[in-house]
Amino acid sequence: MIDSSTNLANTSSNKPHNYHEQSQIDQTVRLREVLKTLPPFVKDYFRAMEPKSSARTRINYAYDIRVFFHFLMENNPVYKNYTIDRFTPQDLENLEPVDIEEYLEYLKVYKRDEDGELITNGEKGLARKMSALRSFYGYYFK
């Protein structure tokens, strides 16, 4: 028999979260923070990929795509005076294959913007970063 005095309030967002729920919340908050550091149009891509990917994948892709935009601002004369919020899908379309080749070379060893730490990527790291970029381009240029 169900007690009619059972409090249904414990189904609200005030109850403690289990590990998986808390991890999802933390990753969602982290993704939102990373998205603030990317061009505004990029949010559309991440909304579209949400149903087909984990929060962790989206965070990693966001970091990888941010590295790409920073690479363009630091190494491509066309984007030297850009701020990250100025980029548009048209800028991506204007890039040449050599720009992507130079990016791939750059990814082997580069300094992280936040702390200047030297980052190196082996084959797996390069493959993931290029996968993020391919997926990103695929969304905008189907």
Please state what every model-predicted region is.
Residues R58-A62:
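A short, charge-rich alpha-helical start-of-domain segment used by transcription regulators
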